Amino acid sequence: MTKTEINKKDWEINVVVSSEKKLWKAKQDLALSNLAKTLKIKGFRPGKASVEAAKKHLNPEQIQEEAVKLIANDLVKIASESIDESYIVLDSPIYEVEKMSDAELDLKFSYPIYPEFKIKNYKSLKVTLSRAKVSKEDVDSEIEKIREKNALLIKKTKDQGKVAKTDTVNIDYVGKIDGEEFDGGKASSHELVIGSKSFIDNFEDQLIGFKSGDKVEVKVSFPDDYHSSKFAGKKAIFDVKINDVFTKEKPVKNDDLVKFLNNPKLKTLAEMENYFKDLIKNEKDEKSKASFKKDIFEKIMNENEIPVPRLILMKETTNAIREFEKDVKKYGFTVEKYLKMLNMNSKDFVTNLNKESELKLKEALIYTEISKLEKIEAQPEDYDVKYKKFAKLYNVSLDSVKSMITQQQAQVAIVNEKILEFLIKHNAIEKNSVGEEPKLSTTKKVVEPTEEKTRKDSKMSTKKPAAKPAAKPAAATKKPVKK
């Protein structure tokens, strides 16, 4: 027997299933048998206790709790079959015990469903979109990074020259405070880049003008906010010997520079410059697009009520917490230690993650609704354009792109990009980065977001929902017990 209730506050379907008495009894017997194998009872070998003996060492609640786990998959099938197909089920259900005794069991299964809502205002919202230009300086800066990265260190002889900015020096040094050496103040053959600011105060500047073989007395002061209070604000004197001086020899800015990019499609410096121009343009437009997207979605949310299913939000927040735990663990922290460093309590931490998760889900719902309202879908030719773009951008083969990005992943990105184009066309006030007056957008052109970023922005597919629920869940998750 089942009893179904639609909860439009939390957007879930609650189905209470009453188990057949015979099935419930059989599952309790099986649970007792399974538990008996885990017990160590005097007079029996481990795991070999009789059911009768085991029953004396277990309370009824233990047996019933184990039996619920065994029967849940049987009852969830009954619950799923009772759901009206007009509702779109978004995920597998969670379950909790409604009523339980030796003779009977009622389980309640809760399914998150797609909410019913309408976005009424998502046009003419007047949101600024900055159109950045790529300058010659931008391109030159990228070329210079390539030259810096591939520069050779050439040793200067004593007669060739003095220490200058950007030179690398090999030094021995001994530091003293009040005439006494201190921990960490001594090193041999240490390599230091002049101008890197890796040493305190103006230590590096005081070496400028000297040559290899010179001995220099360097006077510095530790900053008042130095991480070790033992040294904070103290004056120190370093006896420094300059062993060697190296200067950078950058590769010449010509066609030969292209080889350092390891891109067989680029042959000349001009091609390399155009490559960086396209890359920088894409990056700048990505930032502009991200800013526009943030502002337009914020306005749409302010203009419309976007309901988020409770269970989906709960799952999204739980996943976010797990991801955060994994991230801090990589750096040797626990969540507790990390939050202590931030002076944040766990309650505020979870609240913040919950808000972020809710925002992401609302964005996904907005994407989905606009795609339905405006009939925005991915066309077969869109996939070819998407794959070719990534192949060109990342200098990989078309087959490699197709193996990395599935058609479903590409579909979400394509539809979301089309929606963003639509929103720009109907809402953007374009502003040139050099300060031109804003003007209403008259073009559909928009820089495409990256695949990974778009997938993160939209956890729900923007494909038009089917007229019936998602595949019937085969398993249910037990609702966490409140402590």
UniProtKB/Swiss-Prot annotation:
Composition-biased stretches (Low complexity): 467-483
Encoding gene (name): tig
Keyword field: Cell cycle, Cell division, Chaperone, Cytoplasm, Isomerase, Rotamase
Chief localization: cytoplasm
Similarity section: Belongs to the FKBP-type PPIase family. Tig subfamily.
Enzyme Commission identifier(s): 5.2.1.8
GO biological process, one term: protein transport
Listed Basic and acidic residues bias regions: 435-460
Name listed for the protein in its UniProt record: Trigger factor
GO terms for MF: peptidyl-prolyl cis-trans isomerase activity
Keyword Chaperone assigned: yes
Organism: Mycoplasma mobile (strain ATCC 43663 / 163K / NCTC 11711)
